[in-house]
Amino acid sequence: MATTNDIGDRGEEIAAAHLDGAGYEILARNYRHSRNEVDLVCRETDAGEYVFVEVKTRSGTGFGAPEASITAKKRAALQHAARGYLHEHGAEGAPARFDVVAVMLTGGPPEVQHYENAFWAD
């Protein structure tokens, strides 16, 4: 039986492959700043903007839609980590956005939903 970590890791791999296939450059995985983490840091090739991605994976619908589990506290943590990444890479003020990739693993082919500009930075 797959553990929660296994399911999450598989979802992140699927999300990264999906984004790569859509023209995103994957810059970092599981980037940590302080105690905050961003699952994927990307750069959209066409627009040149940084994209901070939260991946939510579910193996069933018992806990609701994956994207519905991103709380205000989680959004704040993602924003903190994103600011840290931009600072560390000398990119403060660069165009950036927050996306969510929801992955459903229900036994058949994975279902992937990509929500661009899923929320705004405070």
UniProtKB/Swiss-Prot annotation:
User: What NCBIfam families does the record point to?
Assistant: PRK12497.1-3, PRK12497.3-3, YraN family protein
**The protein, known as:** UPF0102 protein SRU_1822
**Annotated Pfam families:** UPF0102
Gene Ontology MF annotations: nucleic acid binding
The superkingdom listed in its UniProt entry is Bacteria
Gene3D superfamilies registered for this protein in UniProt: 3.40.1350.10
Concerning its family, UniProt says: Belongs to the UPF0102 family.
